[in-house]
A protein has these predicted regions:
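Mobile cap/lid helix-loop segments that gate and shape the active-site cleft of serine hydrolases
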Residues: 3-52
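Alpha/beta-hydrolase-fold catalytic nucleophile elbow
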Residues: 1-4, 62-64
Length: 140
């Protein structure tokens, strides 16, 4: 895990490790087998191919990809960002024939209600379009 050099990134990494330790009694580094079984996907193909269970499921991942903001504000490169494995997940699903697997990329759309820039904000999703997509999936 690369937390970066920003305080918010370090605190986020600590919170995640603590949550995993509490929930599963170990971290992924300490007991990778638990996380292999729990994870729907891993970049490391040695940890199974759990994405196979999603090959017939409509899947979307949404990401506000602003590399310069990440570097400047969080001290983080793209290497450890969640859009890297998400894009590989979508790629693998499409290679399996899943035409309903989509990587939804936005740029500089993530803002909290108070105006604070944050790439994990719900504002990265076009709500109306997403609802229409969900309804289309249900009707299928």
């Amino acid at each position: 895990m690369e937390p970066g050099n920003a305080t918010v990134s370090i605190e986020e990494a600590k919170l995640l490790q603590s949550s995993l330790q509490t929930a599963y009694g170990s971290t992924p580094a300490e007991n990778p087998a638990i996380y292999r079984d729990l994870s729907p996907f891993s970049l490391d193909e040695r940890f199974g191919n759990n994405e196979q269970w999603l090959k017939d499921v409509a899947v979307r991942t949404y990401h506000d990809i602003d590399v310069n903001w990440r570097i400047k504000e969080r001290g983080q490169s793209v290497f450890y960002r969640n859009y890297v494995p998400s894009s590989e997940l979508i790629n693998r699903l499409q290679k399996m024939g899943n035409e309903r697997a989509e990587f939804m990329q936005t740029y500089q759309t993530g803002y909290r209600l108070n105006g604070q820039r944050h790439p994990h904000s719900w504002s990265i999703i076009d709500a109306e379009e997403c609802v229409q997509w969900i309804l289309g999936v249900w009707e299928r």
